[in-house]
Amino acid sequence: QLFDQVVKGFPTWLKLDKKENPVQFKIQVWHAEHRIGFPWSEIRNISFNDKKFVIKPIDKKAPDFVFYAPRRKPDTIEVQQMKLQDFEQKTK
């Protein structure tokens, strides 16, 4: 699976890779040129709550990796009206 988001204008991906062995997985997170990998055997827990994806490693001294997936808020009425006016002007 691939979770996609844009952070400060650059795409960021969270990907779950399946290796040759059906029980081996690897999680990769990368942003532009930076890539972070998590072997499945080193992950204690994975949780997802609304906008936050958390990977907890087996080593309790290691920090948790938190991946935020912002949700797009619906346009306000004013913005919707401006878009409608712009669309009407373009179609004339």
Swiss-Prot record:
Q: What InterPro entries would the database entry show? A: ERM, FERM_PH-like_C, PH-like_dom_sf
Statement: the UniProt record of this protein carries the keyword Phosphoprotein = yes
Q: Which residues carry this modification: N6-acetyllysine?
A: 15
Localization in the cell: Apical cell membrane; Cell projection; Cell projection, Microvillus membrane; Cell projection, Ruffle membrane
What regulation of activity is recorded for this protein? A head-to-tail association, of the N-terminal and C-terminal halves results in a closed conformation (inactive form) which is incapable of actin or membrane-binding.
- Reported modifications of this chain: Phosphorylated by tyrosine-protein kinases. Phosphorylation by ROCK2 suppresses the head-to-tail association of the N-terminal and C-terminal halves resulting in an opened conformation which is capable of actin and membrane-binding. S-nitrosylation is induced by interferon-gamma and oxidatively-modified low-densitity lipoprotein (LDL(ox)) possibly implicating the iNOS-S100A8/9 transnitrosylase complex.
> Quick one: where is this thing mainly located?
membrane
Q: Look up and give the membrane topology term.
A: Peripheral membrane protein
Q: Would the keyword tRNA processing turn up in this protein's UniProt record? A: no
Keywords from the UniProt entry: Acetylation, Cell membrane, Cell projection, Cell shape, Cytoplasm, Cytoskeleton, Membrane, Phosphoprotein, S-nitrosylation
Give the region (Interaction with SCYL3) as residue ranges: 42-92
A Gene Ontology cellular-component term: microvillus
Q: Give one GO molecular function term.
A: actin binding
Please give a single GO biological process term from the UniProt record.
Answer: regulation of cell shape
Q: Where is the FERM domain?
A: 1-72
Domain of life (superkingdom): Eukaryota
Q: What does this protein do?
A: Probably involved in connections of major cytoskeletal structures to the plasma membrane. In epithelial cells, required for the formation of microvilli and membrane ruffles on the apical pole. Along with PLEKHG6, required for normal macropinocytosis.
Q: Quaternary structure per UniProt?
A: Interacts with PALS1 and NHERF2. Found in a complex with EZR, PODXL and NHERF2. Interacts with MCC, PLEKHG6, PODXL, SCYL3/PACE1, NHERF1 and TMEM8B. Interacts (when phosphorylated) with FES/FPS. Interacts with dimeric S100P, the interaction may be activating through unmasking of F-actin binding sites. Identified in complexes that contain VIM, EZR, AHNAK, BFSP1, BFSP2, ANK2, PLEC, PRX and spectrin. Detected in a complex composed of at least EZR, AHNAK, PPL and PRX. Interacts with PDPN (via cytoplasmic domain); activates RHOA and promotes epithelial-mesenchymal transition.
Domain characteristics, as noted in the entry: The [IL]-x-C-x-x-[DE] motif is a proposed target motif for cysteine S-nitrosylation mediated by the iNOS-S100A8/A9 transnitrosylase complex.
What's the protein here called? Ezrin
Q: What is the lineage of its organism?
A: Eukaryota, Metazoa, Chordata, Craniata, Vertebrata
